[in-house]
């Protein structure tokens, strides 16, 4: 069943995140929260989005396995969730990051080093398709994440979640949805391209942003 997420789903959503993004910096903060203390920052992160845009946070709820996937995003003229998260958790994030670095945690070191290496004075995103540039941010949304547990893929969960997500966005007057993906994530790129997205911009060889007219 595909349904809107609730706060009771957050621990299961974090579990899906940890499995699907096991080597990410965000997962490290979540994995080590019991050792370092301060609560699970991933729960706090997703809660910000769930509170602000509950209709844009959907889950795949399997009868036998429970929550096996989620899809979420935000409206581009109401994109202060990350800012709110950092404002409320900045000290915890810094403290945990420092301890993880001292412990030699590789994903954390990679994140910090990338942050210092890549600090352009202007945006290094290059728009390659401007045919929808007349559509304002007040009519745009962003699909931030769609993921399904590996052993539950191929059953249509991702497709059904994304359709519900895009329908909710369209019902609220959005005309364009953006989504970004790493250039080397060929599986995700093929999936999005099968769903009729168009390339919008590039960031060197690192990332791509697609767009879909609603």
Positions of PLM-derived features:
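A short beta-loop-alpha structural element at the N-terminal edge
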Residues: 1-15, 22-27, 75
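Conserved GNAT-fold acetyl-CoA-binding loop/helix
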Residues: 22-45, 87, 92-93, 99, ...
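A short helix-loop-beta-strand connector motif used in the catalytic cores of GNAT acetyltransferases and
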Residues: 44-59, 77-81, 142
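Conserved beta-strand in the GNAT
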Residues: 59, 66-75, 130, 142-147
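Conserved acetyl-CoA pyrophosphate-binding loop and the N-cap/start of the following alpha-helix
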Residues: 60, 152, 156-164
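Conserved acyl-donor/pantetheine-binding loop and adjacent beta-alpha core of acyl/acetyltransferases
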Residues: 79-140
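Conserved active-site alpha-helix within GNAT-family acetyltransferase domains
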Residues: 123-131, 159-160, 183-201
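Conserved GNAT acetyl-CoA-binding A-motif
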Residues: 139-141, 168-182
